[in-house]
Amino acid sequence: MRISTKPDDMGCCRTMMDTLMNIALFYWAGEITGDEKFTEAANAQIKTTDNCLIREDSSSYHHYQFEPGSLKPLYGVTWQGNRDESTWSRGHSWGVLGFPIAYTYNGDETLKTLHKNVTYYFLNNLPEDLIPYWDFDFTEGDEPRDSSAAVIAVCGMLEAVNYLPETAPEKKVYKTAAAKILEAVIDKCSYEDGEDFAGLIGHVTGARPQGIGIDACAVYGDYFYIEALMRYVNPDWKRYW
């Protein structure tokens, strides 16, 4: 197992997939203050994510390095993924959820296609039992799974269902996939009363290359599990960001 082999001594000027989950705060700040710089920053981050972190085949880098000073785009790297050119499954799921949330704020129609492409990549790389491995380099074998990536992606698909017209073919795909993945998580990853557990779902992988939180419970896994359930049983559930 290895981390990135690229230079890591720049100390700054990186972006990463995880930051998509902070975008809503910038849009909210723009709405509350009336200061367009927050909205502009959010839109710029979305554009940068699309241009630099999403590859041509709709897979994703975890991080992307820019040249300090000039901010010239340099190369994609990883920290929690298997290798620089692989796709870390939870990082990719941040895109499955983050892009439709951004769409609800800025109404940019190109985000629908972007979201569809990254979501289909996620779905097309799931193993038969629908619980993703920690990195999409793996589709079988004994490598750890990451149930948190599954429930985050479910949240993203159900978010997109809210704004897609009934005529959009991906709407049915999202509904069906979300139901099947959520059922798989309940069957294979959730704990029952009386079991000795530290959370609601197991088989979360925090950072495999660093040996952190392997096949464990995690607060973010539990949170998005509950959110996924709420979204599924109550389609009118409203986000609070």
What are these regions (language model features)?
Residues 1-241:
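Glycan-recognition and catalytic cores of secretory/periplasmic carbohydrate-active enzymes
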